[in-house]
């Protein structure tokens, strides 16, 4: 395994590519669950498999855009029976000189020239409808104005959000085919970690078991298990070897000390190392490997470093597994100077202000306080940047 220190953008793209590659491989080899069909409520937040076509037009008929009267020809108009929303469209034609009261959304009868708004006309003493405010607008929504029959509503790989589900429902969709959520396992390594209470000197509190599954779920994965692993080479190898999930996320053990066994364990179980460290700090000693139908995302043990690695690589990795496109990063403008006198990218949690992005306080690889109230992460290249410079941000999945 040759160590190649990847720039963070390249590592992010590689994680996405490897997720997509595994998804394609498992589909071809029929490994694991295939796409599932869910009703719209159950499919919210899931990823569409294949293009979603509209089974019906929106609206499905020529309809009134306002409450008022459907009219034909010039007024005054003779009034006919009212038409209300929910009424079955009639073939009875509206002839010139006639009008019918109509409610918003109701189908306009054939022959309608326009809908006169209720505030623009009135019925005179003789019972005729008379317009008192001129208007050139028709106030009629033509069938298919919003969505045409058979139109692609959303392309495959799109996440079904509530507004998208609402539009799908409006066009007559009842259920959709979605990608199965990739299963994930979290393994927290370290003899010094305790699961509850205030840690004693020499111990640290487990901050990952409660949080990493939620972050993975926000990416679209399905965490199925978490476990604690001792700083033991055999134990580490056994845990990695036994995993059958699509994604295994580990924390700790990726550096080079005598108690760091992840790299050796990956080699021992025959995993292929795909990303061997990333040129950022915090988070440099993160690893990505694959064996068979399982990807291993191995993060540093320091809390901020692990969170940086999970956001930088974990999100793109799950997106690739689900067939989603890689989310673009965009740019934010710095409100202050940010020095970086070391090689590689400096990742900082930041707050958005009217003047631009301001790095949060209390930031080291071991601190979470700066991340707790952050609006996102930003990456400052070697040499630093000055106020007014644009830098790439990375969205936090919980914001």
Explain the meaning of each model-derived region.
Residues 1-174:
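Phosphate-interaction motifs
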Residues 1-17, 212-220, 247, 263-267:
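N-terminal intrinsically disordered, low-complexity, charge/repeat-rich segments that act as generic
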Residues 139-250:
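Phosphate-binding glycine-rich loops and their immediate beta-loop-alpha structural context
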Residues 218-330:
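Short glycine/threonine-rich loop/turn motifs
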């Amino acid at each position: 395994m040759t160590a190649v220190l990847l720039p963070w953008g390249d590592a992010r793209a590689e994680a996405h590519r490897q997720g997509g590659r595994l998804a394609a491989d498992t589909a071809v080899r029929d490994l694991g669950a295939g796409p599932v069909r869910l009703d719209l409520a159950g499919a919210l937040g899931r990823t569409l498999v294949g293009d979603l076509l509209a089974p019906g037009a929106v609206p499905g008929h020529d309809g009134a855009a306002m409450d008022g009267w459907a009219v034909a020809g010039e007024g005054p108009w003779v009034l006919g029976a009212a038409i209300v929303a929910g009424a079955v469209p009639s073939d009875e034609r509206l002839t010139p000189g006639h009008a019918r009261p109509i409610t918003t959304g109701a189908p306009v009868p054939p022959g309608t020239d326009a809908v006169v708004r209720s505030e623009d006309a009135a019925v005179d003493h003789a019972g005729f409808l008379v317009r008192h405010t001129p208007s050139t607008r028709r106030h009629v929504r033509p069938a298919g104005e919003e969505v045409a029959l058979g139109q692609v509503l959303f392309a495959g790989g799109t996440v079904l959000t509530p507004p998208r589900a609402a539009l799908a429902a409006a066009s007559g969709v009842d259920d959709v085919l979605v990608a199965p959520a990739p299963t994930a396992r979290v393994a927290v390594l370290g003899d010094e970690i305790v699961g509850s209470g205030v840690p004693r000197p020499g111990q640290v509190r487990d901050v990952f078991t409660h949080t990493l599954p939620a972050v993975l779920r926000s990416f679209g994965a399905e965490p199925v298990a978490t476990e604690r692993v001792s700083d033991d080479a055999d134990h580490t190898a056994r845990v990695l070897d036994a995993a059958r999930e699509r994604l295994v996320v580990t924390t700790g053990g990726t550096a080079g000390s005598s108690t760091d066994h992840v790299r050796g364990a990956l080699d021992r179980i025959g995993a292929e190392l795909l990303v061997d460290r990333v040129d950022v700090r915090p988070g440099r000693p993160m690893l990505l490997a694959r064996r068979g139908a399982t990807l291993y995302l191995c993060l540093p043990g320091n809390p901020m470093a692990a969170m940086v690695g999970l956001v930088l690589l974990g999100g793109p990795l799950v997106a690739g597994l689900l067939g989603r496109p890689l989310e673009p990063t965009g740019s934010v403008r710095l409100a202050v100077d940010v020095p970086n006198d070391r090689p590689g990218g400096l990742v900082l949690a930041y707050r958005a202000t009217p003047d631009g992005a301001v790095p949060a306080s209390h930031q080291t690889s071991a601190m979470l306080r700066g991340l707790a109230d952050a609006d996102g992460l930003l990456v400052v290249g070697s040499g630093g940047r000055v106020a007014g410079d644009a830098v790439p941000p990375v969205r936090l999945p919980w914001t």
